[in-house]
A protein has these predicted regions:
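Conserved C-terminal beta-signal and adjacent last beta-strands/turns
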Residues: 2-12, 22-126
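Surface-exposed cleft-lining segments at the edges of enzyme active sites
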Residues: 18-19
């Protein structure tokens, strides 16, 4: 599609204790990230889907975490003023308010990750 950018990346990590033939602790689950981006002059819109698999290849003292899907949105407006580049950024994270647990979190047994969130940022590049 004209004027759209499609981005995709994947992350797969394996760690095995060769001496004991067991998984190493704190290995992240498999992840696929898909993004569609639309630029309109100085306005950039990005919709992102993150697909994270369950982690059941567990090291000592670890507990299994379920897989999850997240939907995120980011809109940024870029402009120049006084020889500097400025950006206004609006983000909505976890749009669907998914309850999920990050396998690498030290507090996953206590509470899930944050639900839907809104962020407004200002950046100045000089």
């Amino acid at each position: 599609l004209k004027y759209f950018n499609f981005l995709a990346n994947a992350s797969v990590c394996r760690g095995i204790d060769l001496k004991n033939d067991i998984p190493i602790a704190y290995i992240p689950p498999d992840l696929i990230r898909l993004q569609i981006e639309k630029n309109i002059h100085f306005l950039n819109n990005t919709l992102e889907v993150m697909l994270v698999s369950k982690q059941d290849k567990l090291g000592e003292f670890e507990t299994q975490t379920n897989g999850y899907q997240l939907l995120n949105y980011k809109c940024s407006y870029t402009f120049s003023r006084y020889e500097n580049i400025h950006q206004l950024i609006f983000q909505v994270t976890n749009i669907l308010n998914e309850t999920y647990y990050n396998h690498l979190s030290k507090i996953k047994m206590i509470m899930p990750e944050a639900g839907r969130g809104f962020n407004i940022n200002y950046r100045m590049h000089f």
